[in-house]
């Protein structure tokens, strides 16, 4: 007999878990112990446990560096304080069409408002932090009745992922706990097992093991559009509950999970990050701190040597304490057996500082705190040059974030907003749509995403700088030659548009080609009218002078008239 859906899910969960635990879990546990002790959930029993988990950490430099990375990535890539993405069309000419440009700008603004209302900006720093330390992070963007979309982060060790044939994550399984009350709220009482129903009456806050799978729907029936025949299925079931019983089965048209990976090698499913690069130095740092503390304690409380006659007698090493020695015993002294060489403490501190620098370098602290760490005042040009140099090191990481995290996130938010708006465009549901109806010129075109965050702008600063230098050089040549024809080679309209694009000027501030042409035609007409008025004035003035000229005498005018 063929396995039921529940049995298939249980078997695949076991296979994915075994692959993850045997290959990746030991390293993740070590990274959690030494860098992010509060992150990672390697047993379902770890939920809601508040005891200390940092007992292996003496020097938390790597923890602080990971915090700087998470804050720097969030502020630099997805800061809610400024627009960090904009939409476009594959056809650049279509972008110059007024209605299309206005619609895209309105959609961008509406999407930013939805993202700000949701919990996205609370979740992203956690995602960046876990990705930097463990190399892989995961979160889901699910529909929400109140905020349109809500984001759910999954900590390391609580989920398993798998790749598609395109080496993109298309499967996520996870094991987690819910209280009996939460299960009733989410799935309804009728879907719960008898055990959980009993807990609702006896202890509604008791924790229950739940499993969730989101994966491609291989049992999809083409042509049907109900929630069990969508491209991806989402299935919840109670671990250890009634056989073949599911808590809920639904689906998604788009994969709702974002699983960014810092760096991936070949066919690997999970990634590696800066945490893996500096874990050795971080462990060495803890050992050095322990040895430094031992050395300093030996200096403050050294091992003591005393005459045998003091055995069993009162002796003191406290400040101001007195220990009396036998006068008859020659050479008997009460003194330290080992004196610490202070130079070793300074040398050990230097080694500790070197190991700390390795952690800072691994987590790009020198990039995100570049200005504050400069030892002297620098010019703005030098700071900008250094920033461009540092961005070269972070460039590949940013490109992977765009592909694994930000593109799917924006696509999912846009998809959910379109779903909310379609029925309201058609008048089937009351209320205002989140998005305005698109202009007919867009048709079925796919939109293009362009990132305008601080880090993205810093990467494009090279392009803007080259345009500035080109225009400046052309102006210098024209000034030296005292000939404006040197500027004929420069297409100023195109130069301005490319520069505005490089520095991410809002599209509403840049006029379309048609608007610019209309302004120039109006200006030319005004100049022509002014020139005609000046010419007409000259003709009138000439006629007036001619009418006042004396033609009775012998002068040039009478001679000319006579000759005619």
Language model segments and positions:
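Extended, helix-rich architectural segments
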Residues: 1-206
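Exposed alpha-helical structural elements
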Residues: 4, 64, 68, 99-102, ...
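Structured, contiguous alpha/beta core segments that scaffold functional sites
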Residues: 8, 14, 142-319
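Charged, amphipathic alpha-helical segments
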Residues: 114-124, 206-218, 478-483
């Amino acid at each position: 007999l063929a396995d039921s859906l529940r049995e298939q899910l249980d078997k695949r969960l076991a296979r994915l878990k075994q692959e993850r635990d045997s290959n990746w879990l030991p390293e993740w546990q070590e990274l959690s112990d030494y860098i992010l002790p509060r992150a990672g959930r390697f047993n379902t029993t770890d939920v809601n446990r508040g005891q200390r988990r940092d007992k292996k950490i003496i020097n938390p430099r790597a923890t602080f560096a990971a915090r700087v990375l998470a804050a720097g990535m969030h502020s630099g890539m997805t800061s809610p304080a400024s627009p960090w993405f904009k939409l476009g069309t594959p056809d650049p000419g279509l972008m110059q069409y007024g209605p299309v440009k206005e619609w895209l700008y309105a959609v961008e603004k509406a999407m930013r408002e939805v993202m700000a209302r949701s919990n996205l900006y609370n979740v992203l720093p956690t995602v960046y932090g876990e990705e930097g330390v463990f190399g892989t992070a995961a979160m889901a963007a699910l529909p929400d009745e109140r905020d349109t979309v809500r984001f759910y982060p999954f900590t390391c060790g609580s989920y398993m992922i798998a790749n598609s044939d395109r080496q993109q994550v298309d499967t996520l399984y996870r094991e987690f706990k819910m209280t009996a009350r939460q299960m009733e709220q989410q799935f309804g009482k009728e879907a719960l097992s008898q055990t959980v129903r009993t807990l609702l009456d006896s202890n509604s806050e008791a924790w229950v093991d739940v499993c969730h799978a989101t994966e491609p729907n291989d049992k999809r029936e083409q042509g049907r559009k109900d929630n069990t025949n969508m491209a991806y299925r989402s299935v919840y079931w109670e671990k250890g509950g009634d056989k073949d019983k599911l808590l809920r089965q639904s689906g998604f048209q788009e994969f709702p999970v974002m699983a960014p990976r810092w760096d991936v090698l070949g066919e690997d499913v999970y990634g590696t990050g800066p945490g893996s690069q500096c874990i050795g130095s971080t462990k060495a740092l803890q050992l050095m701190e322990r040895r430094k503390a031992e050395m300093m304690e030996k200096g403050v409380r050294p091992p003591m040597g005393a005459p045998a006659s003091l055995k069993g007698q009162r002796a003191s090493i406290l400040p101001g304490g007195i220990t009396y020695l036998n006068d008859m015993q020659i050479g008997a002294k009460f003194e330290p057996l080992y004196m610490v060489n202070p130079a070793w403490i300074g040398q050990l501190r230097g080694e500790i500082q070197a190991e700390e620098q390795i952690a800072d370098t691994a987590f790009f602290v020198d990039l995100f705190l570049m200005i504050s760490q400069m030892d002297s005042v620098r010019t703005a040009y030098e700071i900008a040059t250094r920033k461009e140099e540092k961005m070269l090191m972070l460039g590949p990481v940013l490109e992977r974030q765009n592909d694994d995290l930000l593109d799917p996130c924006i696509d999912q938010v846009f998809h959910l907003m379109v779903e909310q708006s379609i029925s309201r465009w058609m008048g089937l549901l009351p209320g205002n749509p989140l998005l305005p109806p698109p202009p007919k010129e867009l048709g079925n075109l796919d939109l293009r995403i362009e990132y305008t965050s601080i880090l993205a702008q810093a990467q494009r600063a090279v392009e803007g700088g080259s345009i500035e230098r080109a225009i400046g050089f052309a102006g210098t040549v024209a000034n030296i030659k005292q000939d404006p024809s040197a500027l004929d080679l420069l297409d100023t309209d195109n130069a301005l548009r490319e520069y505005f694009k490089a520095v991410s000027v809002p599209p509403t501030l840049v006029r379309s080609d048609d608007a610019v042409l209309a302004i120039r035609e109006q200006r030319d007409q005004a100049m022509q009218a002014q020139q005609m008025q000046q010419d007409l004035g000259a003709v009138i003035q000439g006629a007036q002078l001619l009418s006042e000229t004396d033609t009775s005498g012998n002068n040039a005018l009478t001679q000319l008239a006579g000759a005619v």
